[in-house]
Amino acid sequence: MSLIHMNVMMAFSMSLVGLLMYRSHLMSALLCLEGMALSLFIFTTLTTLNLHFTLANMAPIILLVFTACEAAIGLALLVMISNTYGTDYVQSLNLLQC
């Protein structure tokens, strides 16, 4: 396993640990999710380039599109929550209410 793959896996695991530790603020959780998505994008790009798997060349681009959609929805949710509640604490949300 190359050094680049180990660094990408370490970045993914650090983002996962950050998501598990700093989940009180929505902005911190969104940043950790973006770090995980970026690590997955780099890993899938490196894998398709190293294996010369031409049928999967679109997979990193599709992952990048879904990551952009996730970021847009997350930021819209963050703006809505901060306008409604005044903070971005996840504990202030009651997900059982409509």
Swiss-Prot record:
| Membrane-traversing stretches | 1-21, 26-46, 61-81
* Record GO biological process: ATP synthesis coupled electron transport
What Enzyme Commission number(s) does the record list for this chain?
7.1.1.2
Where's it mainly located? mitochondrion
Q: Where in the cell is it found?
A: Mitochondrion inner membrane
Q: What class of enzyme is it?
A: translocase
- Report the membrane topology from the UniProt record: Multi-pass membrane protein
**An annotated GO cellular component:** mitochondrial inner membrane
Under Gene Ontology molecular function, one entry of this record is: NADH dehydrogenase (ubiquinone) activity
Determine the domain of life of the protein's source: Eukaryota
Q: Which residues form a coiled coil?
A: none
Enumerate the InterPro entries for this protein.
NADH_UbQ_OxRdtase_chain4L/K (IPR001133), NUOK/Mnh_C1-like (IPR039428)
Q: Which UniProt keywords apply?
A: Electron transport, Membrane, Mitochondrion, Mitochondrion inner membrane, NAD, Respiratory chain, Translocase, Transmembrane, Transmembrane helix, Transport, Ubiquinone
A Pfam family it matches: Oxidored_q2
* Gene3D superfamilies reported in the protein's UniProt record: 1.10.287.3510
Quote the catalytic activity from the record: a ubiquinone + NADH + 5 H(+)(in) = a ubiquinol + NAD(+) + 4 H(+)(out)
What is the protein's known function?
Answer: Core subunit of the mitochondrial membrane respiratory chain NADH dehydrogenase (Complex I) which catalyzes electron transfer from NADH through the respiratory chain, using ubiquinone as an electron acceptor. Part of the enzyme membrane arm which is embedded in the lipid bilayer and involved in proton translocation.
Q: How does it assemble?
A: Core subunit of respiratory chain NADH dehydrogenase (Complex I) which is composed of 45 different subunits.
Q: Which PANTHER family match?
A: NADH-UBIQUINONE OXIDOREDUCTASE CHAIN 4L, NADH-UBIQUINONE OXIDOREDUCTASE SUBUNIT ND4L
> Per the similarity annotation, which family is this?
Belongs to the complex I subunit 4L family.
Q: What is this protein called?
A: NADH-ubiquinone oxidoreductase chain 4L
Q: Which organism is it from?
A: Physeter macrocephalus
